[in-house]
Curated annotation (Swiss-Prot):
It catalyses: 2-C-methyl-D-erythritol 4-phosphate + CTP + H(+) = 4-CDP-2-C-methyl-D-erythritol + diphosphate. Pathway: Isoprenoid biosynthesis; isopentenyl diphosphate biosynthesis via DXP pathway; isopentenyl diphosphate from 1-deoxy-D-xylulose 5-phosphate: step 2/6. It holds the Pfam family IspD. It comes from Thermotoga petrophila (strain ATCC BAA-488 / DSM 13995 / JCM 10881 / RKU-1). The keyword Transferase applies. One of its GO terms (molecular function) is 2-C-methyl-D-erythritol 4-phosphate cytidylyltransferase activity. This is 2-C-methyl-D-erythritol 4-phosphate cytidylyltransferase. Belongs to the IspD/TarI cytidylyltransferase family. IspD subfamily. The gene is ispD. The keyword Transferase applies. GO terms for cellular component: cytosol. The lineage of its organism: Bacteria, Thermotogati, Thermotogota, Thermotogae, Thermotogales. The record marks 14, 21 as: Transition state stabilizer. Gene3D superfamilies: Spore Coat Polysaccharide Biosynthesis Protein SpsA, Chain A. Keywords: Isoprene biosynthesis, Nucleotidyltransferase, Transferase.
Length: 222
């Protein structure tokens, strides 16, 4: 059984909106509904768990009607806490693999879901990633130090793992930027799956405007 964990518990404070960004509506759908729709259509996914804050349960329940949705789980104050809540909820389902995705990355393609899961079956863990094409610098005391671009990737989601591996990675708590970090500390090789620029995360208002433009054509994009 392959289960997608859709993280939708963030506060979206950098967006400066009264509503968390995952619940902002673009082209008739809330942001979280875009990746959710991809999971529901994907033949590679058997079930979906949506993680959000208790005060948004009713909103999610009204928007979600599908047999693939296994449940709505209360998230924590941090990303890692939310992932652990989902893993605990999933114990009774005994999934083989779980796929973790940020709801603020609305434009998820089915081919990426399938490929990340395929690579995770080979190594135990895989993530969507994008080669960096920009110049990178580290700034300290107003001095710029240039970072070589070769071998530098942006880590995206979705990320897929053996359920047992991800559960073990989180069993001692901890706070992580994403889930590949604690998994790699177990000595597990993380497979990288090439993504594309559409996998961006909506963080600022400018991102939301770009998302509106893409959403108008999303159903036509293969």
């Amino acid at each position: 059984m392959n289960v997608a964990i859709l993280l939708a518990a963030g506060k979206g404070e950098r967006m400066s909106e009264n509503v968390p960004k995952q619940f902002l509506e673009i082209e008739g759908r809330m942001l979280f509904e875009y990746p959710l729709s991809t999971f529901l259509k994907s033949e590679a996914i058997d079930g979906v768990v949506i993680v959000t804050r208790r005060e948004w349960f009713e909103v999610v329940e009204k928007r979600v009607f599908h047999e693939k949705v296994l449940g709505i789980v209360e998230g924590g104050d941090t990303r890692s806490q939310s992932v652990r809540s989902a893993l605990e909820f999933l114990e009774k389902f005994s999934p083989s693999y779980v796929l973790v995705h940020d709801s603020a990355r609305p434009f998820l393609r089915k081919k990426h879901v399938s490929e990340v899961l395929r690579r995770a079956r080979e190594t135990g863990a895989a993530t969507l990633a994008l080669k960096n094409s920009d110049a990178l610098v580290r700034v300290e005391n107003d001095r710029m130090e240039y970072i070589p671009r070769k071998g530098v990737y942006r880590i995206l989601t979705p990320q897929a793992f053996s359920y047992e591996i991800l559960k073990k990675a989180h069993e001692n708590g901890g706070e992580w930027a994403d889930d590949t970090e604690p998994v790699q500390k177990l000595g597990v090789k993380i497979a990288l799956v090439e993504g594309d620029p559409l996998c961006f995360k909506v963080t600022f208002k400018e991102d939301l405007e770009l998302a509106r433009i893409i959403a108008r054509e999303w159903e036509r994009i293969p």
